Amino acid sequence: MSEVKRTQQGRVVSDKMDKSITVAIERFVKHPIYGKFVKRTTKVHAHDENNECGIGDTVEIAECRPLSKTKSWTLVKVVEKAKM
């Protein structure tokens, strides 16, 4: 049986590490009392084998086995490069 891998889209906020990127994933959550949709951000570390991502790129990442203490996502593809 094959597992369905969880994928997310997000924006690269840091690429200072070697073969690693920090991706900010935005989601909208409904406020429990007021009902307004509020933007929430989650930051995750992802593995970038070829160091191809830059700050501001929109990327797709997939969940994988833990690669380090904080890194358990891997880069699938760069959806859109950042405008310089």
Curated annotation (Swiss-Prot):
InterPro entries: NA-bd_OB-fold, Ribosomal_uS17, Ribosomal_uS17_bact/chlr, Ribosomal_uS17_CS. One of its GO terms (biological process) is translation. It holds the Pfam family Ribosomal_S17. GO terms for cellular component: cytosolic small ribosomal subunit. GO terms for molecular function: rRNA binding; structural constituent of ribosome. Gene3D superfamilies: Nucleic acid-binding proteins. Keywords: Ribonucleoprotein, Ribosomal protein, RNA-binding, rRNA-binding. One of the primary rRNA binding proteins, it binds specifically to the 5'-end of 16S ribosomal RNA. Part of the 30S ribosomal subunit. Belongs to the universal ribosomal protein uS17 family. This is Small ribosomal subunit protein uS17. It comes from Vibrio parahaemolyticus serotype O3:K6 (strain RIMD 2210633). The gene is rpsQ.
